[in-house]
Amino acid sequence: MAANRDYYDVLGVSRDASDAEISKAYRKLAKKYHPDLNHEAGAEEKYKEVNEAYEVLHDPQKRQQYDQFGQAGMNGQGGFGGQYGGQGFGGADFGDFGDIFSSFFGGARQQVDPTAPQRGADLDYTMTIDFMDAIKGKTSEISYSRSTTCEVCKGSGAEKGTHPITCDKCGGSGMMTITQRSVLGMIQRQTTCDKCTGSGVIIQHPCHNCHGKGVKTQKQTLQVKVPAGIDNGQQIRLAGQGEAGKNGGPYGDLYIVFRVRPSKDFTRRGQTIYTTVPISFAQATLGDEINVKTVYGDTKLKIPAGTQPNQKFTLKEKGVPSLRGGSTGDQVTTVEIVIPKSINEAQRKALLEFVKASGGSIAPQEKGFFERLKEKLS
């Protein structure tokens, strides 16, 4: 990460921010700098920076180590980089560098109860919709896969009529403390229990339905209401439609990111719709009333006499509705004066009379080779 920026500063959160606040900040920044959505210079590097910060701060173990030792605690094992990491100093295993200081100064790692309820993970779903559906809204059905709590064991992972038992090796903590000799003396380090693999419990009789996992992967079908006015890259949250939680914890959420197909008739920027309509020289000069397409159907537009090329006209409340309700945007229509590539003799004479009446003149065009040849032969 550039200049070893503080991870908390990268995510824009305080050092005592909760896991929920960190996740919320990450999701917002990841969306802002995602290379598929942001093509500005430096966006991809910023996206990597945000991911690096989140990778550390959302993990309780890595976050504690970072809080104690900063960037040094993230290099190698326990902050010793290069040749002194891991098995440096004659083969002494430093493991988690934070535990060395814990053993000297009486500190203790804040442990998370592995049997406590844990919220399920969030899911993302990309939904592609038509331009008009983004303007007016619609209801659409989606299908996706997610883990759901096993209906047989209710998430315990144990066969019906049995229960998980506390791991006798780690006492239910999911962690083991190992004492080792080092050049600094006797040190202690913590590692995941190899018997219960960190769960804190042993399932002697696994559930036949979920094979002891407590969850099953299933296909989920939902009716999604696309809000009128949604824009490309925006998202909505469907609470409780993510992955199943653990130990009775709540489900995560489902975030639906919208991709809007472009329109051949309209361009959108925010709540404003932009269009271009062709008019003739005569219409621009004399004025007229024309039909103009809008996202709500055709409407009349009065072209005043003397309209200039690329002149813009605003059609009030013919744009995009606000997602939060309230006012609707406008449509800006630009007129393009079309000059004919060829005209007949009557039109040419009329234009020359127009020029003459305006006090101007038109230099006669030089005749082409075939016209001159025709005159000589006649």
Curated annotation (Swiss-Prot):
GO CC, alphabetical: cytoplasm
GO molecular function terms listed in the Swiss-Prot or TrEMBL record: ATP binding; heat shock protein binding; unfolded protein binding; zinc ion binding
Cofactor: binding comment: Binds 2 Zn(2+) ions per monomer.
Primary location recorded for the protein, binned into one broad class: cytoplasm
SUPFAM superfamilies per UniProt: Chaperone J-domain, DnaJ/Hsp40 cysteine-rich domain, HSP40/DnaJ peptide-binding domain
Gene3D superfamilies registered for this protein in UniProt: DnaJ domain (1.10.287.110), Heat shock protein DnaJ, cysteine-rich domain (2.10.230.10), Urease metallochaperone UreE, N-terminal domain (2.60.260.20)
Cofactor(s) required for function per UniProt: Zn(2+)
Self-association state and partner proteins as the record states: Homodimer.
Protein name: Chaperone protein DnaJ
Record organism: Lactobacillus delbrueckii subsp. bulgaricus (strain ATCC 11842 / DSM 20081 / BCRC 10696 / JCM 1002 / NBRC 13953 / NCIMB 11778 / NCTC 12712 / WDCM 00102 / Lb 14)
Gene responsible for this protein: dnaJ
